[in-house]
Amino acid sequence: MGRIPRVWYGNAYSRSGGLTDYNRFRSYSDVIGPMPAASVADPHFFWLGPTSNYEVRSAWYGDAQGTDPNFEAPSKWRQNIGLDIITKKGYDFTVEYNKDETSEGVFYKDLGLTQTGSLADGRGTYSGAGDFWLTNTNKGQAEAITFIMKKAFGDVQFMTAYTNMNSDDVYPLTSAQAESAYGYTQRWDGENLNASRSSFMVEHKFLATLDYTRQIIGNNDTRFSLVFVRKAGEPYSVSFDEPGYNSVTGNSRFYADYSLAYIPTGATDPNVVFASSDVANAVMAHVNSTGLSAYKGSHAPRNAFNSPWYSRLDLRITQDIGVFDDHKFIVYLDLLNLLNMIDDEKGIVREYSYNNSRQIMVSGVSDSGQFLISGVDPDDNLWIQNNDGQSAWNINFGFKYQF
């Protein structure tokens, strides 16, 4: 796999504990004045120096981050095998299988993590210092198998393919900072993390292309190209919607709303206390009508579910216009996401933000460790994703000169 983002190494230097005078000084602080040459009371730079007159952060902020001296850059063992077959009738088949096994993966530990007790479902309660340690894990794997078929039918070129993928990892690692990479990870019990379905895998993907070329205007090629894609949605987790900034475990280093939800067995489940009978009925109706029912009395693993499937159809029309010799203009028209152009309810990507859905609402835990369930939000955090225009139709027109 090779390199990792350098900022992951940089955390140990920028957050080394009391060596740094600067620690997120805020403009509301009446103790710390502006740094030299700073025009505001909340400077966004680091000021280092053992002779500094500025206040060093208190012990509460004295977390320190480090890197395991035996840390190895991520690596995997990779195997693949492929088979190509061309039949007498012109069918071109390809089958390819890939298998990855993690040799050295990335793992974050809080060296100050301490278990303080247990909750009703068996998960621990914790306190943490935020002394994050960059180290390795050998957990994780990925495998994929792809089938491809190609065939020419006169002026028509046809291709279809299918890929099935299964990929597991420990941390999604979507953040540059150790604390957020650690905190924004769905978990059941502290750092007892197993490899789970990756947030980035596409379990099923179908692809089909159709290409038709005909000389409609003189000896100039007119080409129609269709591309159809249908794929499974991203994996996501079902978590508690937690109050405040702490998880139900009591540890602020595990970010709120990222605790995997306990799934009640029914209205009389001894591990939970429902706010009312109406809340109990609503929660259990949701559980019994979804895949959560398979996990009653426990929790659904990280990324156990999938967002809705997505389909897309694109069309490109190109027209050659000969000029002289081998010189020609190529005019093209792209109709992107035709399904959405025809029906604005089609061709839409719906995903759970950060692969997380806070469906079971809790107000806290009881003195005996029961979860205080206050409600249910069946489609929490489900959004239409359109940052790159993937949920909207598009028309592009252009030309190029080829010689």
Please identify what each model-predicted range represents.
Residues 1-133, 253, 271, 292, ...:
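Solvent-exposed loop/turn elements at secondary-structure boundaries
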Residues 7, 79, 89-91, 154-156, ...:
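Outer-envelope beta-barrel architecture signal
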Residues 67, 77-81, 143-147, 204-210, ...:
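Hydrophobic, lipid-facing positions within transmembrane beta-strands of outer-membrane proteins
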Residues 125, 305, 343-403:
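C-terminal beta-signal and terminal closure region of outer-membrane beta-barrel proteins
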Residues 223-324, 357-383:
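Extracytoplasmic gating/loop element in the C-terminal half of outer-membrane beta-barrel translocons
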